[in-house]
Amino acid sequence: MAYYGANVNAFLYMGTSTATPLPAPGADSFTVVPLLGSVTPPANELTTAFFNILNDGDRRSVGGKLNDRTSEGNLVADWTSVIHQAMEADSIVPGGRKRNWYIVYPDAGARRDDFVAFISTWTKEAFDAGEDAKEHRVNFTLTVDGAVTVTY
């Protein structure tokens, strides 16, 4: 099967375990998410606060904790794919079904971001029979629970 992500060699992998607690990534088995169109790695964004000091014209700022971290992407829907079926099923579990996930970067250093996340958004795009019709896609958001571990 051809993977859409192959054009840049960036891939998203989904862990098979949904146990509580989840196993360490090295003890889980993973499957590549097929027909991946795009994936955005989780961002690092700190909360910030501002304050003023009396008789000082400059505003001061301080950084806090990491904001919510998400990974957004889309895929070409293949409803015969067990992975796509599992992702859709996970998206309607109250409280979120957490899994291990990782993204492999397309760089020579083979960077890998490991994280625990649940599917918080699963949106099927509109069917479009217009001149510029494209494959039916699904947009998704993975909400990270905890830290993102980077390995090379």
Question: What residue ranges belong to the model's regions?
Answer:
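Short beta-strand and beta-hairpin "edge-sheet" elements
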Residues: 39, 104-152
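Solvent-exposed edge beta-strands and adjacent loop segments
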Residues: 2-76, 120-136
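Beta-strand secondary-structure signal
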Residues: 70-74, 100-102, 139-143
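Acidic glycine-/aspartate-rich tracts in secreted/extracellular proteins
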Residues: 78-81, 147
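Generic hydrophobic secondary-structure signal
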Residues: 1-2, 142
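Short, acidic/charged, Gly/Pro-enriched secondary-structure junctions
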Residues: 80-118
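Sequence-level detector for tyrosine residue identity
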Residues: 3-4, 13, 102-105, 152
